[in-house]
Amino acid sequence: MPVYTPQSGSLPEYSKMKLLYFSNELPKDDLQGLFRRLYNHSKDRRYPLLARFIHEATLAVREEVRQLPTAVKALVPAFETVLNLADYPELRKGPLGGSLEGVLLCVLEIATLIGHVPRLYFKEAADCCSYYENASERFDLHAVSTYLAGLGLGLLSTAAVALCSALADVPVIGAEVVRVSFRLGTLVDEISQNLEPRDTSGSPDTWASVVPGAKVEEVQAELDAIHAREKTPQPSKIFISAWNEGSVTISGPPSRIRRVLRLSEFFRRHRVVSLPVYSGLCHAKHLYNEQHAREIISTRSMDSINALYSPAIPVYQTSTGRPFTASTAKGLFEQLVLELLTQPILWDNVVQGVVDQAYATSATSCDVLVFRISVPINDLRTALGSKLQGFETSTEELIPWILQKSDMEIPRGTAQSKIAIIGMSCRMPGGATDTEKFWELLEQGLDVARKIPADRFDVETHYDPKGKRVNTSHTPYGCFIDEPGLFDAPFFNMSPREAQQTDPMQRLAIVTAYEALERAGYVANRTPATNLHRIGTFYGQASDDYREVNTAQEISTYFIPGGCRAFGPGRINYFFKFSGPSFSCDTACSSSLATIQAACTSLWNGDTDMVVAGGMNVLTNSDAFAGLSHGHFLSKTPGACKTWDVNADGYCRADGIGSIVMKRLEDAEADNDNIIGIIRAAATNHSAEAISITHPHAGAQAYLYRQVMSSAGIDPLDVSFVEMHGTGTQAGDSVEITSITDIFAPITKRRSAQQPLHIGAVKANVGHGEAVAGVTALLKVLLMYQKNAIPPHVGIKNSLNPLFPKDLDKRNLHIPYQKVPWPRVKGKKRYAVVNNFSAAGGNTTVCLEEPPLRETDYVDPRTAHVVNVSAKSKISFKKNLERLVAYLDANPDTSLASLSYTTTARRYHHNHRASVAATDIAQVKKKLLSYIDKVEAHKPIPATGPPQVAFAFTGQGASYKSMNLELFHHSPYFRSQLLHLDALAQGQGFPSFIPAVDGSHEKDYAHSPVVTQLALVSVEIALAKYWISLGVKPNAVVGHSLGEYAAFHVAGVLSASDALFLVGRRAQLLEEKCQIGSHKMLAVRAPLADIEKALEGTNYEVACINGPKETVLSGSQAQVEVVSEILQSVGYRCTSLDVAFAFHSSQTEAILDDFEEAAKDGVLFRAPNMPVISPLLGKVIFDDKTITAKYMRRATRETVNFLSALEMAQTFSTVDEETVWVEIGPHPVCMGFVNATLPAVNETVASMKRGEDNWVTLCNSLTALHCAGVPIEWNEYQRPFEKGLRLLDLPTYAWNDKTYWIQYNGDWALTKGNTFYDAEKSLKAQQTGQLASVPSGLRTSTVQQIIEESFNGSAGKVVMQSDMMQPDFLDAAHGHKMNGCGVVTSSIHGDIGFTLGGYLYKNLVKGGKAPDMNMANLVVLRGLVAQKNTKKPQYIRVTISTTDINSGVAELIWQNVLNDNTADEPFASASILYDDAALWLKSWIPSTHLVQGRIEALERLAEDGIANRFTRNMAYLLFANNLVDYAQKYRGMQSVVLHELEAFADITLSTEKSGTWTIPPYFIDSVAHLAGFVMNVSDAIDTKANYCVTPGWKSLRFAKPLVAGAKYRSYVKMIQTEEDPTVYLGDVYIMQDGAIIGMCGGIQFRRYPRILLNRFFTAPEEAGAISHAAASSTPAPRTKPEPVPVATPATAAAPVAQSPAAPASVTPAPAPAPAPGPTPAAAPAAAGESDSVAAKALVLIAKEAALELSDLTDDASFANLGVDSLMSLVIAEKFREELGVTVTGSLFLEYPTIGDLRSWLLEYYN
């Protein structure tokens, strides 16, 4: 038979005849099972057209259902796909029976055809995929010898083939067939019901019966006689709808058929048989006409199909046996429908038509394709055989394809994926600290309920069985986790304080998440599915007991992040650096399983690729016990939940934490994960029809089960275990068993003896964990899969609940009173269902499938393996070692290869490390035990980061004649690199070097120098790339002699092709021009100076100076022999090197010219991408000029001074003592040189060793590198062998647990809320800060309310209060943004000062002319930042006063107003000097020409390109990028010319009108903030690392008013002060029309590290919440006090850091570079330091972070101690208050370890 290929363009044509027959009957077997299998096939990637057809058909049916009358529409249940309609057989007996019968028949036949067609031609699944990819091509059924036939509604299905030009067309046309069948059914029902209404009281009646053995003429005569006698109306007459030689079918209204059959002797004689036709009449010409047919097919979709398709394959009419004659798609549909409605079925005519066709075409055979063999097909085969001599007929059934099970399941997309559970962990009541202990508890049938333990609350005072005492529990029982406070805080980077304040359930959630991930073999970014951006966390939590009760007793720093639910999964995401979603879900009792369903949905939607999910519950709040008691939820009697017991009286509350890890199944399989269970489907619904919100509803539960089973594509009878919700309440248990039996053990369709169903409920063992209940049940089922057993149910203490069905045995449903085996069954899968219901009405159900078996006979070819153990603490390190040894003792047959894979590629690696290389398990145990013995002396890898790595490339002296490299044979990457290099070499005309490395020759076989040298360099290049692929990347390289070529390639100097060319060409020249063996090389174990002394007067050459005592000499053979004899005679060891030529000697001179010429021609030398240590030059090369053809010439001839090169590299810090050296070559030689030259070097390792298996050498080196802190890509190392390796379920991390627990004290939970104080008015007044105002006419945008004023003679005082949140004030502040927040610029202070100064003067000097004012000596100690909450006021208070106005001076102070309406300490001060502007103008005249001269000089510098000129937009863009983002009205500078710290600007003031001002702040700022621009934009300041702000000025005065729209020019030059290099001073001159009209004199700027910007400029939520302590002024430091960063033009005042107890001062003490870290020691170390500031500081740190002083070793980092940013601010404030040490929160970033901080404190504060 020809085979279709994509290239052929169409399916092959056949000479034989083909007939495709569509039946009119649905299969008699399990229809639901067939549709379920179709659904599963549609989820497979190999059947995209099947999925599309089902989708299109579903849409078509839904559209038709929408158009039904309301009453009929209500009969149709919600359906996910059209396939779901098979689940409702009762619908096929009602008004939609005909429609649904037709829909299901057409769907089944067309879907089967789509799935089966490729298998008519292809055996392999891959070929089927290829077929579908080319489905747009024509397929075989369109050959000219193909015909279609059908009976009844099957005739409609023929259109799906007849109209299609390609298989890809079938889904759309097939969906139209389904639509037409639905419409045909509704029409037939409507017409038929007009003849005889449906009898709904009993079983449906038939509309057709068959009369066997009768002749059509006799039947028609009898009917005619009866109709005449009965005077039957024409529409109601019984008629003949079909006949053949052996029978006649009559049709008509059911009651009339019954009457005829009862009264007619003729029909009684023929034993009439009723047909299952319940939906009305077809084949009735007297009832239907062409108009009916056109009504059925008149749809918009039909018009679209008619435009695209036309009939291509003939279809036989069932009445005449001739093909339909339609030429259009619409015409064919109309003829098909009309045939069904009006024409009788004469199958004999169809048979004759096929016979005639075969005869006419001289066909000798016919392939008949049928869905199932039936009587019409047998008639056809008989006729063909009898009427056509020698005619062969073959028949193939299509339905069996549906029943086939594929060996390969490929989901079509993520939505069709199964979900694999790959890791799990738990903490459960009864001491179940892991899943194994949990199983032991279940297996033993334990009930772990007990009295409420004392660490929760005092049960004696909080329990009242009578329920009379307020707020008490009615039960004293529960199921509890042992010691829920245990936690390894340092592991999770949490301080003891934070750990103590964090909810224990959230702590245990992150612990179990880690354990589940560890068991899942999770390593971040190891595979696409473990990409950190694609991992999410989902946890269910339904209570906040610990936050509400325990931590609420003394609210502190971590009350919110430690207790609020969102932080649980959020903390897991943060710790693991997952960037996917984190959800905390509360659906009451179903929280965890509903959350797991949400997690599955995330995977199905493709939102995530891996999820960590679970639930958590730790009970500490007596209120919940009381509330549930009063709600009648809880059992009052001892024991866990009495599930299914006659005396069940409520549930028993329980703790629990459970975590699982999930991926899509295909990802888990690709990632080589252990699959411990599979989720096939999950869903949630709500018991909306229940009698109350807390009451269950059997109907809702049953509906949910159907939905889940349908989505899973699983027959409910195939489910063998249901884990029920089973809380032990009378209502809940009885309702749930009703819904379970209805769906999973129905009485109508019973389970076979081979299909037992067991039920269980874990709450009988460990109680109801509420939010954790669902995942607890899920873990139980996963353990059942692992253990192949069902644990006993222990909830029935007395007898079974009488509300349970009495026929459980008949239903084959069993309660396991004892442990029951649950083995795997070959060829079948174990399915289980887990239920989890919510007290709030939600129902969640998950369908599980057993994990697949994995078998392999793979043998890892590697002879040695690496096993790693690590931990974050020494205690855990020892425990982890001990656990692994114990595991190996218990599992002596453990695969070493899989153990290595698990502990390297599938584990995180912490700083305490053990790494062993071994060839068997016994060796592993021995080496691990040696680690345990030395654990106290073990040192962790440094926390400073991985060490530098240097590659040393071996020269030819280390090479051996023929190698047999195991890496070449077993490492695909290494092998491919060598083969690529060999191809490059051969491409340049050199011989292959592979025979020198593949073991094809004996080891002593001598290859040519060309092959030998090419092999050496290529092996080194391949080795280097292999190391780099394993994550070992060099920071520097050095090559010895020939090894330099490989080094140059790795450093990027030479391409691989050029390196091989140079090596090969050099070897060729040596072969051509030098005699092999004429010269020798001699290695001497002696310093060069000693050799020179011993050989004085002897001829020799120095080839290599390898080390202090390692020298290589060269010369002619005779010379070398003489030299060797002399040196040996004086005691020096000499070794003759086995090399063909004497390199680096005069022998090579013959090739130098030719070699240099070759190197010049076509070889490209590039700049190195890393330092290259040159043994030729004895220096480190960084540039692209040094390594040239000349260099290569010199390197060939001149001495290799390896010693000098290494010493120089160390001198220039290219390498140091911490550098790790990797020798790249076939045998380690250079390592000895390195160790001799740099004796303190960290580690030296080899790549290969002569005579040692490559894998043994490599493993030993990998262990050394790993323990040195080099980050190895273990996954890359194991990847080539991964499919044969298994992830072992090794012991999880051994925690260094300590108890962190805040005990609930007393009984305040019982007595709360009984005393109230009516302080509403007082509180409101405090909150609004309102004070009685003094009548005053003064009100501006910044001076809003005068709250106090007094005038006594020449003395006076005015106090104003303003709300910064008022629109104009807030707008002014937001016009000057720093770090994204509005900051009050000093120009606003200026406006306030001038306003109050004028008001004070006018009230003290009546009628006098107001003088001009100079606002002098402004000092701002702390900045003023607009708060975030604009709905609450933010008040400031400013006071101006004078003791004598005649003195011409008034004093100003600024204060914040606190929540209690008191004023804080002053944060700013200034003076108003009353003066005469005329005097100012006169005094400025001498300065005018000087200023003008500097402006002109700047202009010239700008013209010469020396100074920078900025446009307005550019200037303010730079300003915004560096510090201040000004609003438009502040942007007065139109252009700026800047050179170093000098600048001038042309200014136009804004004309925008907003607010009421004395001098608008944006006017002052525009003319003065040039100084800020200079300090924050000039390249004379390191603006990247620093920013500058001003604490004030000496004077601010304007001789003329600033006018909107007017033009001005400002000039400033800032000068660095001598006494403090961080402070700059300057005068800003404001000019108009060439004259100075204003001045901001003595403006000061201070430079601050940019890292402090967030610290100083962050908007508080509510500024008034800052405490007095936080806002108080800074205590005087040891040096001259300096104001903190504040604002004036161009910047803003530094606010108090807005956090609890933030320090007021932010001026850092000097911060020199930290000294090298001392060796770890408990701090303080020195005896004399006990009273030092440093010692007190450490005590304070320990106290605040709840640490022991012994924890504060010098090498301990604050990050690892849990001192986060929040804690840093708290400690910084304590330093200021208690030690007088003013620091910032960033101090712990600048000095990251205890030792760094201690050294700084000792230096500056002792």
UniProtKB/Swiss-Prot annotation:
Entry keyword annotation includes Transferase: yes
Pfam families listed in its UniProt record: Acyl_transf_1 (PF00698), CurL-like_PKS_C (PF22621), ketoacyl-synt (PF00109), Ketoacyl-synt_C (PF02801), PP-binding (PF00550), SAT (PF16073)
Region N-terminal hotdog fold, annotated ranges: 1344-1479
Enzyme class: transferase
Residues of the Ketosynthase family 3 (KS3) domain: 416-850
NCBIfam families, per the entry: PT_fungal_PKS
Designated name of the protein: Atrochrysone carboxylic acid synthase
Organism expressing this protein natively: Emericella nidulans (strain FGSC A4 / ATCC 38163 / CBS 112.46 / NRRL 194 / M139)
Phylogenetic placement of the source organism: Eukaryota, Fungi, Dikarya, Ascomycota, Pezizomycotina
Name of the coding gene: mdpG
